[in-house]
UniProtKB/Swiss-Prot annotation:
Quaternary assembly: Hb2 is a heterotetramer of two alpha chains and two beta-2 chains.
Gene Ontology terms: biological process: hydrogen peroxide catabolic process; oxygen transport
Binding site for heme b: 63, 92
Protein name per Swiss-Prot or TrEMBL: Hemoglobin subunit beta-2
Amino acid sequence: VEWTDFERATIKDIFSKIEYEVVGPAALARCLVVYPWTQRYFGKFGNLYNAEAITGNPMISKHGTTILHGLDRAVKNMDDIKNTYAELSVLHSETLHVDPDNFKLLSDCLTIVVAGQLGKDFTGEVQAAFQKFLAVVVSSLGRQYH
């Protein structure tokens, strides 16, 4: 993947501005509410009966924050995202058996939450760079499935 200077700067800027403990949990909770079939991977997380239970679940919050911090690895290794996530791809495909389409669903929810947090600063150009970044991450996480 080729990154422009604008894209690199934009991705770093986004991750320097967002609140991980807010955005991560909100994105994961949104994914679980909007796409309820994704809840099957979180059976050990307790009550996911409705939106209120999901958004108030401390395990969902913690995992959402963990996911967002996991994206830091891609931000720091933008030229080698595929290898950066090689082990995580194996874990999700061979151990957790996560449907790789769910990575895209989560990335869409993350885009919505980040847009809400950044407001007018989340221009079309910024969104394009962010979605390109997330598409590379999603592809890398799904790599083991191919």
